[in-house]
């Protein structure tokens, strides 16, 4: 349970399992006063009506592709997009990543808790600044 078979035949964690590990660690750090985080949920809510699944549209101001987790740490704004080893960004996620970086934020595609721990404890400017027009 919580595993998915990769194309290579190896078994890897599902995105939800990776996210749960990350959130557990972030909660520990938040309780220690070391950061603030918010798990975002951009999936429109659905419900059954007359035997059909009906999806509510996203709330006003909510953006498709927003990172799964937003972290504030020591003046840094960090977007974490959780993916499996083979997961890829959607076009919406790529646009949000550009917006984060253009406006001074950090954005990481993370595939493990260890990667999150490294990125949060080793602030670097890996991304190139996008020149404003």
Predicted feature locations:
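Catalytic phosphate/metal-binding cores of nucleic-acid and nucleotide-processing enzymes, i.e., regions
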Residues: 1-133
């Amino acid at each position: 349970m919580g595993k998915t078979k990769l194309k290579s035949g190896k078994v890897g964690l599902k995105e939800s399992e990776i996210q749960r590990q990350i959130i557990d660690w972030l909660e520990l750090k938040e309780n220690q006063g070391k950061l603030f985080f918010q798990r975002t949920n951009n999936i429109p809510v659905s419900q059954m009506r007359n035997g059909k699944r009906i999806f509510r549209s996203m709330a006003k101001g909510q953006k498709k592709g927003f990172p799964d987790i937003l972290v504030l740490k020591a003046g840094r704004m960090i977007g974490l997009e959780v993916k499996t080893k083979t997961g890829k960004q959607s076009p919406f996620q790529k646009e949000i990543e550009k917006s984060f970086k253009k406006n001074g934020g950090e954005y990481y595609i993370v595939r493990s808790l260890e990667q999150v721990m490294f990125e949060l404890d080793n602030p670097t400017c890996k991304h190139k600044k996008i020149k404003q027009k």
